[in-house]
């Protein structure tokens, strides 16, 4: 058991080769019968797993191992503003023999479109939308990395301004954040990873715990001094000093009700939506809009009650289709059945590819999304295999990408296209 625990720890080691070595040793323990997979009763998939290259408790190696041992049939990496963890993710997937797909999540500027004044799917800022670049062909990763690098730099400039704002809010209480010493070390910036608001809040969480300890003193400070609203369930978790996920629960509370006080609007760090669509077309990747939907109760505890796209879905789908998006990604566990039925209906009306996007970035989230067992989501399982098939085909020849001009000429019906690429995903050698 000590060996197992040591190997699990090594999955998040600073050194990439150590992480991958741990995957190999753990898989050997599995094949020898010393480790069992979690039993599952369905072919579960997930295409939206964050790693330490944006924000997550999991390195790419650990994310793959968690996906494998949890019983996922496929796993997809989706980091914010970074493809730095992609090659490790692919290699780890090949070690444990799990099908993988790779992508990048980006915030885009919607100025000049009919959505520019809307609160779209971004809790912090109107006119800025979260979008996903799915199924990046492996030969296009370097181009994608070059594209996003200047935006990472601009984000760093804004991050420093937000750290200054935080210090102005908490400095009187003996707390001071240093961007270089406190924030960057909890990121993978040194290896091409992005630095996000979550990294800043994680660093702040460490400072708060160091200053006030865990439990009632800290809860009292948050409520009485910072005037942060904490829902009863999260207050109970933060009152428990033995809570193993304390840092992440504290981060969730801060993200829900503190960010708006120090937030600096994003501008230069967000490529224009036209640039993003152009990148997807040039690289043979799939441009997907990330549906959030109006939030009543946040599943992850990091979003307050807030309205997003649901009041203007006609306009939204008209505009994303006009702009060149080919897909919509959504999370079955995060929305109501009524919301999801509407989204599926709109995707069908506009012939948009539907992708499962269960956002994994905290240790409380399960890799298995039980909601996928509902018959209404059968298409998402097929879509995951189609994504994998697209990636395999496009990695050998961009003309073979799922939405290339050649594929557009070949397929009229979207379901025929999905079925074709699904067969490629499940049978790697028999395509085209």
Q: Language-model features: where?
A:
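Repeat-unit-sized solenoid/scaffold elements
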Residues: 204, 307-311, 315-317, 355-373, ...
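Low-complexity, serine/threonine/proline-enriched polar segments
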Residues: 134, 191, 204, 222, ...
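Low-complexity, compositionally biased segments
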Residues: 8-9, 84, 90, 168, ...
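A metal-dependent hydrolase metal-coordination microenvironment
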Residues: 39-195, 323, 329-388
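Extended, intrinsically disordered, low-complexity segments
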Residues: 373-432
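Acidic, metal/ion-coordinating pockets
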Residues: 1-3, 360
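Domain-core and long-helix interface of multi-subunit machines
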Residues: 4-58, 70, 147-351
